[in-house]
Amino acid sequence: MRKPVIAGNWKMHMTCAQAREYTAMFLPLIEATPNDRHVVIAPPFTAISSMAESVGGTRLELSSQNVHWEDDGAYTAEVSPTMLLEHQVRYAIVGHSEPRKYFSESDEQINRRARSAQAHGLIPIVCVGESDEQRERGEAERVIRRQVEQGLEDTDPDKLVVAYEPIWAIGTGKTCEASEANRICGLIRRWVGASELIIQYGGSVKPGNIDELMAMSDIDGVLVGGASLDPESFARIANYQTS
């Protein structure tokens, strides 16, 4: 049985003080959230420690926004799996379209990050998705399949999450039709050959479309950006209803 993962990616938002204030508002809103789903937030690295103090014993789980493949070393601006594990972090986002774009992260590097996360007991959330130009040229499926095959090489699909995030829908207000997102997620499941693989959709997810997205047969959660910055908005997403 695939247990959905509802994850909020705060990106470069929230100071430690703001994160504590958010958590105090958010936790009561998910006290009655059904146990058939995971609720996760990926704060900036600076806020992970303070949030870990607040979320222990609650429904809320923590993710990092990236993770390196080494335990330590001369890797300025990176964070290691062992550092994250000290702060109750359970998930690690890898391969998000922004590091791919701004820091030229390759599929090989993303795979190394994912394998390292798994080796340390973290659950990688491996992001894949096509740009608007690739979609217009009819290359979307080829691009996504390459990212999936190279990014997941030598990993255990039962201990990771794949997030399909069409780049053209991230932060643009454009949303991939639920049926099309479901079709792509189904393709990813078949390419990986793992019926229990958890596959999220990410791209302008908001309270107004969460119920439709989560009603799809191959969508097992969402990776939320802007809408996760408001506790009431993200709580509505976490408390989605499909019937």
From Swiss-Prot:
It comes from the Bacteria. One of its GO terms (biological process) is glycolytic process. Keywords: Cytoplasm, Gluconeogenesis, Glycolysis, Isomerase. Pathway: Carbohydrate biosynthesis; gluconeogenesis; Carbohydrate degradation; glycolysis; D-glyceraldehyde 3-phosphate from glycerone phosphate: step 1/1. InterPro entries: Aldolase_TIM, TIM_sf, TrioseP_Isoase_bac/euk, Triosephosphate_isomerase, Triosephosphate_isomerase_AS. Signal peptide: none annotated. GO terms for cellular component: cytosol. Its main location: cytoplasm. It is found in: Cytoplasm. Involved in the gluconeogenesis. Catalyzes stereospecifically the conversion of dihydroxyacetone phosphate (DHAP) to D-glyceraldehyde-3-phosphate (G3P). Homodimer. This is Triosephosphate isomerase. The gene is tpiA.
